[in-house]
Amino acid sequence: GLTISEKMRKQIKGLDRASTNAEDGVSAVQTAEGALTEVHSMLQRMNELATQSANGTNSNTDRKAIQDEIDQLTTEIDRVSETTKFNETYLLKGDGAEKAHNVNAHDAGLDGVTLTDKGNEVEVTLKTLNAGDKVSIAGKNYTIGGVTADVTKMLGADGANIDTNHDDVTVNGTIYKWYDAIAADTTGAGYKGTEAGWYSKDPATLDNKTKSTSPEYKNAAAFAAVKGATISVGSKSVTTIDDTKADGIDDNDSTVITARKAYQLQTAEIVKASSIGTDTAATVKANAGNTNADYATATTTFTLNKGTVSYKDSLSFNLHVGADADMTNKITVNIDSMNSAGLGVKGIKADTEQDATYAIDAIADAISTVSSQRSSLGAVQNRLEHTINNLDNVVENTTSAESRIRDTDMAEEMVNYSKNNILAQAGQSMLAQANQSNQGVLSLLQ
């Protein structure tokens, strides 16, 4: 009985302590959750301010005042993260050394843009634009023109004696030729346009060949992005292509641009919107058909390297809620770094209309991050409440069992005591009666 009762006592005391551990865990979780409630409130205020700043009725002075408050709020978010602690354990500042973490990409509010997350990268698909389409980019309205580049008329050249009529190009209702004349050359009977690479600064030329082939204008759009690019036909003619001339033609409060130019502008804005809150900005991934630095190919699909920001990894601690050393008695609590870097709003700006517009998405992500963390903490707290109830139940019943072995059964003993007491009193009564009878006989004899 002693061995069994001591084993039970060990379990009872361990479970009592485990229940207290769980209660301490609830207190720690409630401390973190309460701090995040204030972080949530500050982010909601920042969202309100960014939305206000994005409105065109605000002056630069107004936006500066808005930016001042946003700066104060981000500073306070960092302070809360750095100082919130329970029993000398900091709860919201993460743990370990700082590491680079990815920041979510954003679509810059562009219509029809699809972002497909692929870990460190995002596949971006832009809406295909056709002639006559209206598109809004960075708060400006554009109309897509009918070709991919503006082409000026071929300049006539002295000595040109072969008239041509190849690859007509229509720009804003005017028909242009790729080239109008080629000089005769006694060394060859043919011609072919040499294709220039994307963003080539060297002119494309027509070289004499032994076989006549049709010229191609594949890279017109790439030339379009380079002001002053030329195409020479032998040494007799020059064509200039300058897409910048398309940017500035008003058409019903819109600017006529090429589809490729629109893709370039959209790409640049997506990069800008996806770089908010980063230490290292997002970039377009360089590959065989996708130039990183200047978005030269600017097609409807490209890959974006996510921007990164440095902050500490999640804080993780275990609550031991059992009497045994079994690892299943551990409940793990994870709390992410909740400073401005971890929330993706580090250094966020809303002092221009466009920056404020992009800030709205970044703040929305931060709010979602805090909501997710609070939800996780709430789930842990609810679990701990059930754990405490179960532990208390086990303690109560184990204590009862141990008591039956180790302790006196007071009810049974009281029954026995009462019975024995009654019997003793009855015996005394009978003896007294017997003594009285003897006295009566003696009295008669006298």
Q: Language-model features: where?
A:
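Primary detection of the long, small/polar-rich alpha-helical "axial" segments characteristic
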Residues: 1-173, 185-188, 193-194, 201-446
